[in-house]
Amino acid sequence: MKIHFVGIGGIGMSAVALHEFLNGNDVYGSNIEETERTAYLRKLGIPIFVPHSADNWYDPDLVIKTPAVRDDNPEIVRARMERVPIENRLHYFRDILKREKKEEFAVTGTDGKTTTTAMVAHVLKHLKKSPTVFLGGIMDSLEHGNYEKGNGPVVYELDESEEFFSEFSPNYLIITNARGDHLENYGNSLSRYRSAFEKISRNTDLVVTFAEDELTSHLGDVTFGVKKGTYTLEMRSASRAEQKAVVEKNGKRYLELKLKVPGFHNVLNALAVIALFDSLGYDLAPVLEALEEFRGVHRRFSIAFHDPETNIYVIDDYAHTPDEIRNLLQTAKEVFENEKIVVIFQPHRYSRLEREDGNFAKALQLADEVVVTEVYDAFEEKKNGVSGKMIWDSLKSLGKEAYFVEKLPELEKVIPVSENTVFLFVGAGDIIYSSRRFVERYQSSKSSPSRVLGSNK
């Protein structure tokens, strides 16, 4: 079958495209711009057109799109004119799963689902189960970063931003939490949002939930948490090299967990994975070995650069909700106790910023200094009065040293540079390219670091 993917550079779309390509289908696609994913897919032999155009047409049997692709996209318009079926990516992905009829491990929720999915996949690979993996991020141990084809069960990250996620029926499901992100896709109805999690839970054989989550804890056949749940934490210690935690089951000391990835939130992610595999009757010794070996996912506290002479670090992170940012900064302050923490944050989506408003500033105030950029729209229409300046204003009212830049190239004028500093480039948009430019400029100048201040402090 000949399949055209509109927006093939997206992390979820590229994984599905890879799956169909490696299963013998004639795959090609288009993207609004060149990305690392489009370059990788092209290297494998998948034709990709940039940008979108009605001329990007090879008489496909099927067109796949995401909700981010508008109905007036020229390729979608042409598909309708040519009477070619158009399917949403998530709908098509469900069809793939139904077609293949394999055992399914799924992870959904607001925060931590990519890392938790990666942990599940890593464990199954360690156990020689040969999983097929669809990941919403890049993990070095997967053959194609965000995808790997196997002969065993399917592991996938299930995006709750679309209500259709409730139509899936995995065998096993971890719900990390449910914080009402993307509520605009549920008619701004918390009840409708909750119902979607309830629906998918009814379709699942085993559900693992966070015992301290208000919306979904009751859905779990088994639960995990800090002090509440089937699996809990008795104590935890952490250093730059590793962290350890003592896990209790039903209130009794059960095992010791060791992780190389930092952050208390990752202890909870691993606890969810332990709860899952223990409930399924797996021998936990190799599961714990796999978790200790786990090295994380790209753009999740990824150290992109370190200058030992000046002790300057540059770290990339995908955090884009207030809770994720709070977890990130708590981790940074734990790992880098003696360094200054500077955050360069790019808000993601107008709808999220409007809904969360002051919550971003409350999370960001954990940093020593903050630079806020304008919003990365993620194909949303701009909303009047909604701007990154909202966060800047809130930070100033909290007494935090903060700066605002409207355009990313202006960052170099305002980033406060000094020795013994950790620069965190944070967001789900294109802020990572600013991180790379910052490192390039720093390496090229490599003079004695001096503090640079902008006029919009």
UniProtKB/Swiss-Prot annotation:
<keyword id="KW-0547">Nucleotide-binding</keyword>
<dbReference type="InterPro" id="IPR000713">
    <property type="entry name" value="Mur_ligase_N"/>
</dbReference>
<dbReference type="Pfam" id="PF01225">
    <property type="entry name" value="Mur_ligase"/>
</dbReference>
<dbReference type="GO" id="GO:0005737">
    <property type="term" value="C:cytoplasm"/>
</dbReference>
<keyword id="KW-0573">Peptidoglycan synthesis</keyword>
<dbReference type="InterPro" id="IPR036565">
    <property type="entry name" value="Mur-like_cat_sf"/>
</dbReference>
<dbReference type="GO" id="GO:0051301">
    <property type="term" value="P:cell division"/>
</dbReference>
<keyword id="KW-0961">Cell wall biogenesis/degradation</keyword>
<dbReference type="Pfam" id="PF02875">
    <property type="entry name" value="Mur_ligase_C"/>
</dbReference>
<dbReference type="InterPro" id="IPR036615">
    <property type="entry name" value="Mur_ligase_C_dom_sf"/>
</dbReference>
<protein>
    <recommendedName>
        <fullName>UDP-N-acetylmuramate--L-alanine ligase</fullName>
        <ecNumber>6.3.2.8</ecNumber>
    </recommendedName>
</protein>
<comment type="pathway">
    <text>Cell wall biogenesis; peptidoglycan biosynthesis.</text>
</comment>
<dbReference type="InterPro" id="IPR050061">
    <property type="entry name" value="MurCDEF_pg_biosynth"/>
</dbReference>
<dbReference type="GO" id="GO:0009252">
    <property type="term" value="P:peptidoglycan biosynthetic process"/>
</dbReference>
<keyword id="KW-0963">Cytoplasm</keyword>
<dbReference type="GO" id="GO:0071555">
    <property type="term" value="P:cell wall organization"/>
</dbReference>
<dbReference type="GO" id="GO:0008763">
    <property type="term" value="F:UDP-N-acetylmuramate-L-alanine ligase activity"/>
</dbReference>
<dbReference type="InterPro" id="IPR005758">
    <property type="entry name" value="UDP-N-AcMur_Ala_ligase_MurC"/>
</dbReference>
<keyword id="KW-0131">Cell cycle</keyword>
<comment type="function">
    <text>Cell wall formation.</text>
</comment>
<keyword id="KW-0067">ATP-binding</keyword>
<feature type="binding site">
    <location>
        <begin position="109"/>
        <end position="115"/>
    </location>
    <ligand>
        <name>ATP</name>
    </ligand>
</feature>
<keyword id="KW-0436">Ligase</keyword>
<keyword id="KW-0132">Cell division</keyword>
<dbReference type="Pfam" id="PF08245">
    <property type="entry name" value="Mur_ligase_M"/>
</dbReference>
<dbReference type="InterPro" id="IPR004101">
    <property type="entry name" value="Mur_ligase_C"/>
</dbReference>
<keyword id="KW-0133">Cell shape</keyword>
<comment type="similarity">
    <text>Belongs to the MurCDEF family.</text>
</comment>
<dbReference type="InterPro" id="IPR013221">
    <property type="entry name" value="Mur_ligase_cen"/>
</dbReference>
<dbReference type="GO" id="GO:0008360">
    <property type="term" value="P:regulation of cell shape"/>
</dbReference>
<dbReference type="GO" id="GO:0005524">
    <property type="term" value="F:ATP binding"/>
</dbReference>
